[in-house]
């Protein structure tokens, strides 16, 4: 009589699967903590001349815009450029912070693709 081959999961594979689930759970818990941490952060971005400051959370949620009186004197078009510069700076810093925090979260877990 021929023996059935089953699903190909030996004890070693089950152990690997169990470890993968544990790692996934660690990442999920860490991601929740990271989300909370990023939400509490305030990341500033500045225009090239420093007259406009944008503050975002670590999750890239806009918090505030501060415009110095000198920026108002430059006219609408220049002011728009300064606000855009400050927003891009804050966004870039926020993205870098998120990336760094995610690398810290996943380092040492030996996750494929990360």
Curated annotation (Swiss-Prot):
Gene3D superfamilies, per the entry: Nucleoid-associated protein YbaB-like domain
A Pfam short name: YbaB_DNA_bd
Lineage top rank: taxon: Bacteria
Subunit structure: Homodimer.
PANTHER family tied to this protein: NUCLEOID-ASSOCIATED PROTEIN YBAB (PTHR33449:SF1)
Family assignment from sequence similarity: Belongs to the YbaB/EbfC family.
Function as written in the Swiss-Prot or TrEMBL entry: Binds to DNA and alters its conformation. May be involved in regulation of gene expression, nucleoid organization and DNA protection.
Name of this chain's protein: Nucleoid-associated protein PCC7424_2224
Organism of derivation: Gloeothece citriformis (strain PCC 7424)
């Amino acid at each position: 009589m021929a023996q059935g081959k089953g699903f190909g999961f030996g004890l070693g594979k089950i152990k690997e699967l169990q470890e993968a689930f544990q790692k996934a759970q660690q990442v999920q818990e860490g991601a929740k903590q990271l989300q909370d941490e990023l939400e509490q952060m305030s990341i500033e971005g500045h225009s090239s001349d420093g007259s406009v400051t944008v503050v975002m959370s670590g999750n890239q949620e806009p918090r505030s815009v501060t415009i110095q009186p000198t920026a108002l004197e430059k006219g609408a078009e220049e002011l728009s450029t300064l606000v855009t510069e400050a927003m891009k700076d804050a966004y870039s810093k926020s993205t870098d912070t998120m990336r760094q925090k995610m690398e810290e979260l996943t380092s040492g877990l030996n996750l494929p693709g990360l």
